[in-house]
């Protein structure tokens, strides 16, 4: 999808990775034209990502990773399932807003589910825990935080067992 998330991801990839080849499938014709004019190295296809002809036009066998980023969870899940059906061994990622859909991930053979709420929480945690925090994640619907941090020599946990490090 060529919504805000898809557009910004494509723009970011264009700006950070040399020779990246990106294709966006966007249903809305006006939006497809708008983002096609804004992106330099991205092919924008106007159509429905659930349409087999559109997937053929996107040349799915040559694609390495498919990221479904529409505003519709069901479309994102179905797109990922169709990609697996037509072009096995591709990495699939789907944006979901309904946490219960994460239960379908393995049965639908989707590699990664993107939950914007959890990603937002992780981003906020990184800023709250400034300094040596490398990554921060929430798990089990936000019940726990997993934080990867660099420990400096003056830190309290140095040379202590993890269970005694507070």
Label every PLM stretch briefly.
Residues 1-166:
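Cytosolic regulatory regions of ion transport systems
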